[in-house]
């Protein structure tokens, strides 16, 4: 029993980027006949593409209401909010953003938002680790400082005070002595050498 020959259209299915000619064929056909069933549309339009390829090309790029340009900050906030609520339900999210396709939103999320969030998590982790290291070093420095204060050499203030004293000055039986750092008040209450010799002369007379 002989096998039936394969459909030539199945063999010649085109893959890869769409050409401008293919885009114009698809646009004109849908403008005249509507979307319909995509597998039948591809054959009827004479395109050597699968029905899925025609559908994605039309919905994501060729529709008149497809919004051009970069996603705005407002749209980005809405995408982040809805993704936190619905997860990866890109078609549902796309319905809240007129002119944006589910494929466009999915690509934007993965290449821009998700990547930025992952980098932010890594940066936060690095900052935390650095801060912890600085805190540990600070604690170690404080501990070392406290240990040095507790175990370091103790200054003998008594020895310093004793070494700063001048020898007592004796004159005969007089035991008056001058402090090493006299104040104005101590000078007023202490006899000078001139006063002392004056008293000696008076006693001699």
Curated annotation (Swiss-Prot):
Cell compartments where the protein resides: Nucleus
Classification via InterPro entries: EOBI/EOBII-like_plant, Homeodomain-like_sf, Myb_dom, SANT/Myb
Keywords assigned by UniProt, alphabetized: DNA-binding, Nucleus, Repeat, Transcription, Transcription regulation
Chain residues forming the annotated DNA-binding region: 38-62, 90-113
Residues in HTH myb-type domain copies: 10-62, 63-117
Tissues where this protein is expressed: Expressed only in flowers.
Domain of life: Eukaryota
PROSITE patterns, A to Z: HTH_MYB
Keyword Cell cycle: no
Pfam families: Myb_DNA-binding
Keyword Nucleus: yes
GO function term, MF aspect, one: sequence-specific DNA binding
GO cellular component, one term: nucleus
Function recorded in the entry: Transcription factor.
UniProt cross-references to PANTHER family, sorted A to Z: MYB TRANSCRIPTION FACTOR-RELATED-RELATED, TRANSCRIPTION FACTOR MYB24
Protein name: Myb-related protein 305
Organism (species): Antirrhinum majus
Organism ancestry: Eukaryota, Viridiplantae, Streptophyta, Embryophyta, Tracheophyta
Gene it is expressed from: MYB305
């Amino acid at each position: 029993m002989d096998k039936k020959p394969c459909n030539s259209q199945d063999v010649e299915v085109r893959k890869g980027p769409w050409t401008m000619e293919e885009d114009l064929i698809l646009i004109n056909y849908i403008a005249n006949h509507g979307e319909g069933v995509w597998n039948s549309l591809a054959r009827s339009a004479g395109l050597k593409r699968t029905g899925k390829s025609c559908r994605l090309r039309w919905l994501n790029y060729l529709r008149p209401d497809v919004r051009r340009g970069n996603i705005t900050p407002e749209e980005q906030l809405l995408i982040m909010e809805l993704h936190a609520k619905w997860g990866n339900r890109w078609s549902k999210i796309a319905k809240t953003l007129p002119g944006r396709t589910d494929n466009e939103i999915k690509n934007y999320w993965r290449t821009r938002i998700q990547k930025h969030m992952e980098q932010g998590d890594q940066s936060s982790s690095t900052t935390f680790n650095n801060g912890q290291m600085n805190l540990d070093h600070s604690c170690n420095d404080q501990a070392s400082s406290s240990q040095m204060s507790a175990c370091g050499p103790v200054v003998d203030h008594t020895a310093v005070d004793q070494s700063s004293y001048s020898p007592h000055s004796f004159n005969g039986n007089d035991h008056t002595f001058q402090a090493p750092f006299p104040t104005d008040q101590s000078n007023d209450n202490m006899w000078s050498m001139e006063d002392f010799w004056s008293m000696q002369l008076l006693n001699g007379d």
